[in-house]
Amino acid sequence: MATKIGIISDPHATPGPVEEALSIFRQEGVERILCAGDIAGYGDSLDETVALLAAHGCQSVIGNHEAWYLDRTIGRGESLTYRYLSGLPLSLKMEVEGKVLYMVHASPPDSLMDGIRLLDEQGELVDRQLIYWTDRLQGLTYDLLVVGHTHQVFAESMAATLVINPGSTLCNHSCAVVNFPALQVHWYSLSSQPLLKSWNWGMNRL
């Protein structure tokens, strides 16, 4: 029987799109929810976003914005936000329906900044980038690699691994559901906005 996993990334302290993604996941009957990091940054509702993710049992990895937040808030360990973010791992590995899934914010094994960027400004695949990252990811033993960070939406096979970036719930207006063991990816748009495949050129694009 198929298992569904809901995947989000880069909510950037903005709970509205996250809440919408969680509603989609409930409707789709997902069994697990993953977030590829950058819960913090840009937005002004970090506490609400963290509370929402925690209440729904979302498993997340740390992103660069969480690392920066924790550096600025040393000693504030009593808040739910601090406890949640400080407990996030650099990476997450699990087996689902016989498939090995690995999640990291930017790129494996544990980078927070070296993001997998495959698309141009129009959201078109850049062949040289695909070749570059396919070469870099040779030797991975994962069936599915989940990343975030670059605010790009893609699912591309590289070497023996399917690499998925669900995009930012805030910037790309996107989330994904993956069916296991077939590794079929279904995309969903958020905030009554079209899904924006590539967003890297300024907050005025929101």
Where in the sequence are the language-model features?
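Short amphipathic alpha-helical segments
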Residues: 19-20, 46-48, 73-74, 115-116, ...
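Acidic, His/Gly-rich catalytic cores of divalent-metal-dependent hydrolytic chemistry
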Residues: 144, 154-206
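Core catalytic region of metal-dependent phosphoesterases/phosphodiesterases
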Residues: 2-95
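Active-site environment of divalent metal-dependent phosphoester hydrolases
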Residues: 12-17, 41-44, 66-71, 109-111, ...
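A short helix->loop->beta-strand "cap" motif at the edges of active sites that frequently abuts
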Residues: 56-58, 142, 161
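Beta-strand-turn-beta hairpins that frame and shape the catalytic cleft
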Residues: 1-6, 93-102, 158-163, 183-184
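His/acidic metal-ligating clusters that form di-metal
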Residues: 26-29, 80-156
